[in-house]
Curated annotation (Swiss-Prot):
Disulfide bonds: 30-55, 32-71
Cross-referenced SUPFAM superfamilies: Interleukin 8-like chemokines
Cellular component aspect of the GO annotation: extracellular space
Chain intervals for the UniProt region annotation (Receptor and heparin binding): 29-33
Protein name: Stromal cell-derived factor 1
Gene Ontology molecular function: chemokine activity; growth factor activity; integrin binding
Subunit structure: Monomer or homodimer; in equilibrium. Dimer formation is induced by non acidic pH and the presence of multivalent anions, and by binding to cxcr4 or heparin.
Region feature (Receptor binding): 48-50, 60-64
One GO process term, biological-process aspect: integrin activation
Length: 94
């Protein structure tokens, strides 16, 4: 094998070993693609608020009756009120 070919092959193999194993599409995908808007507060066990640079505000809820996780529409009135209360409470603590 030619020395140039061997050097090129070793460089290519080295860069393959250094790259992260996730495809670009998985790195930038938002967790919520669909939103539920007709979920009563009483059916929710807890909320998780996700905010990333690539996605708009994402609110993930775990349901009480089956433990399923769903994405809630952040424009729903009761969610807006909940977020406002949470932000006010956080501002008072600091």
């Amino acid at each position: 094998m030619d020395i140039r070919t061997l050097a090129l092959l070793s460089i290519l193999l080295g860069t393959l070993c250094l790259t992260e194993g996730k495809p670009v599409s998985l790195v930038y995908r938002c967790p919520c693609r669909y939103f539920e808007s007709n979920v009563p507060k009483s059916n929710i066990k807890h909320l998780k608020i996700l905010s990333t640079s690539n996605c708009s505000l994402q609110i993930v809820a775990r349901l009480k009756h089956n433990g399923k996780q769903i994405c809630l529409d952040p424009k729903t009135k009761w969610i807006q009120e909940y977020l406002e209360k949470a932000l006010n409470k956080k501002a008072k603590k600091t």
